[in-house]
């Protein structure tokens, strides 16, 4: 029986393989969540550069939020990331949820980024 870590690594690689097949040069919106925080970044895989990033560890978000581990925090990160992406000139991205299911905080971040103007 595979360990939990092995299962997560296999799931993340499966998701990334699907993303590479449909990306067509679009940057990737990568999401990582821990038990206390959520992080998101837009990565240009062709150039190997991070275009925009946001997380609940940033001082302005950290002071405004009660905790970094709820859907309100994920929504704030999604809106901030969409704002930074539009300043950088990025509109179309591919959503990379990694090994995390599209539910709860990951879904809240994605919906807030869509409302902020990102297309995926």
Curated annotation (Swiss-Prot):
GO BP annotations, alphabetical order: translation
Entry superkingdom: Bacteria
Matches recorded under InterPro entries: Ribosomal_uL18_bac-type, Ribosomal_uL18_bac/euk
Keywords: Ribonucleoprotein, Ribosomal protein, RNA-binding, rRNA-binding
NCBIfam families tied to this protein: L18_bact (TIGR00060)
PANTHER family: 39S RIBOSOMAL PROTEIN L18, MITOCHONDRIAL, LARGE RIBOSOMAL SUBUNIT PROTEIN UL18M
Family listed: Belongs to the universal ribosomal protein uL18 family.
Protein name, entry field: Large ribosomal subunit protein uL18
Species name: Sinorhizobium fredii (strain NBRC 101917 / NGR234)
Gene behind this protein: rplR
